[in-house]
Amino acid sequence: MATFVELSTKAKMPIVGLGTWKSPLGKVKEAVKVAIDAGYRHIDCAYVYQNEHEVGEAIQEKIQEKAVKREDLFIVSKLWPTFFERPLVRKAFEKTLKDLKLSYLDVYLIHWPQGFKSGDDLFPKDDKGNAIGGKATFLDAWEAMEELVDEGLVKALGVSNFSHFQIEKLLNKPGLKYKPVTNQVECHPYLTQEKLIQYCHSKGITVTAYSPLGSPDRPWAKPEDPSLLEDPKIKEIAAKHKKTAAQVLIRFHIQRNVIVIPKSVTPARIVENIQVFDFKLSDEEMATILSFNRNWRACNVLQSSHLEDYPFNAEY
């Protein structure tokens, strides 16, 4: 049922996955179980979401029920930027692996390129509320992550929220052992990322779209922010296909060969979000949706925009 995108490692990454950012404890376990039953095989996780232990319980239960085998699942997690120092990479990774109750990850990503001050505080800020940078860079972290691949603990590495300049920096790193297989970025019709997708694809790097529905439940949403799910043109296209706005927004990525990870903890929506393989948007509809771009970001983490590796000062 699920279709895949082939990575540069020849591994197959399911093109639709379940996002777990902002999925609350007490709900995320059930969400993952519902997703696996609905045919999802790709689950997107992260250390900073602080819910990996519940995701892990759900995966374990489904494996024990023989509903799915580990090798059929594609599990992604991310290294948070307070852990860029080599020994800390290992520590953070081991906690993720233990919480997820797995013996390996399919892909391990660098969550953001800008390093934060090391320590227990995941969001180290100064008295003005600005993020405090760290000494280690994403290049330091990458070397430690490559060791995890050598040890069979991770199948492949990737990045998230990287601009093409940062990917370039990584690809040009002397002694680079493993290239990133994906760049996970915010992407939806108001932020179509055409140049970045073109660049990544030209380098053999897939793109994974987070917040494909425009992250309507983000805690910092303002009433005047645009709403994709309520966009009349999206709703019009959806009605034509007898689909929902969310299904159109997800299908839009699939047709660009972009992996997409909608988040939901509502069982009916989790099921709905993967029922996207039985219709096709026309070239005209795709062009219309692409024309909505306004470079609007739901997630711009402005409190770290002064740091050297902040990604969004670049055009793409």
UniProtKB/Swiss-Prot annotation:
Q: Which residues form the active site?
A: Y49 (proton donor)
Q: What does this protein do?
A: Catalyzes the NADPH-dependent reduction of a wide variety of carbonyl-containing compounds to their corresponding alcohols. Displays strong enzymatic activity toward all-trans-retinal, 9-cis-retinal, and 13-cis-retinal. Plays a critical role in detoxifying dietary and lipid-derived unsaturated carbonyls, such as crotonaldehyde, 4-hydroxynonenal, trans-2-hexenal, trans-2,4-hexadienal and their glutathione-conjugates carbonyls (GS-carbonyls). Displays no reductase activity towards glucose.
This protein's name: Aldo-keto reductase family 1 member B10
Q: Which GO terms describe its biological process?
A: cellular detoxification of aldehyde; daunorubicin metabolic process; doxorubicin metabolic process; farnesol catabolic process; retinoid metabolic process
Q: What is one cellular component GO term in this UniProt entry?
A: lysosome
N6-acetyllysine occurs at K125, K263
Which chain positions carry the site (Lowers pKa of active site Tyr)? K78
Relay the record's extra comment: Has no counterpart in murine and rat species.
- Phenotype upon changing C299S: Decreased affinity and reduced catalytic activity towards 4-hydroxynonenal
Recount the UniProt induction comment for this entry.
Answer: Overexpressed in certain types of cancers, including hepatocellular carcinoma and lung cancer associated with tobacco smoking.
List the PANTHER family: ALDO/KETO REDUCTASE
| Keyword Oxidoreductase tagged | yes
Q: Which organism is it from?
A: Homo sapiens (Human)
- Its family? Belongs to the aldo/keto reductase family.
